[in-house]
Curated annotation (Swiss-Prot):
Part of the 50S ribosomal subunit; part of the 5S rRNA/L5/L18/L25 subcomplex. Contacts the 5S and 23S rRNAs. Belongs to the universal ribosomal protein uL18 family. One of its GO terms (molecular function) is structural constituent of ribosome. Gene3D superfamilies: 3.30.420.100. GO terms for cellular component: cytosolic large ribosomal subunit. This is Large ribosomal subunit protein uL18. InterPro entries: Ribosomal_uL18_bac-type, Ribosomal_uL18_bac/euk. Pfam families: Ribosomal_L18p. GO terms for biological process: translation. It comes from the Bacteria. Keywords: Ribonucleoprotein, Ribosomal protein, RNA-binding, rRNA-binding. This is one of the proteins that bind and probably mediate the attachment of the 5S RNA into the large ribosomal subunit, where it forms part of the central protuberance.
Amino acid sequence: MNEKKQSRLRRAKSTRLHIRALGATRLCVNRTPRHIYAQVISADGGKVLAQASTLDASLRSGTTGNIEAATKVGALIAERAKAAGVTKVAFDRSGFKYHGRIKALADAAREGGLEF
């Protein structure tokens, strides 16, 4: 595994340990060059309460690897999380920089009503 990926995974592990210590429900984000995924995971880490990604039928028709798509995923995850009864989450960016698509998803989720 290359050094850049190892550093990202180390940051992700550290963040997840901190969130687990808080006992908070987390909004976990993962990105690939082509897609972006978001899950709301329960505080114990055992259950996915809501999920959204660019693979969803409603979002798949457009482009999937850009900031516009990440914004749509953020709005969709906020809507689904609220439907599941979740309003407060800890943002788990999986070690990715808070920039670009990750930032766009987080901003859209906040506008959709999720509290970080």
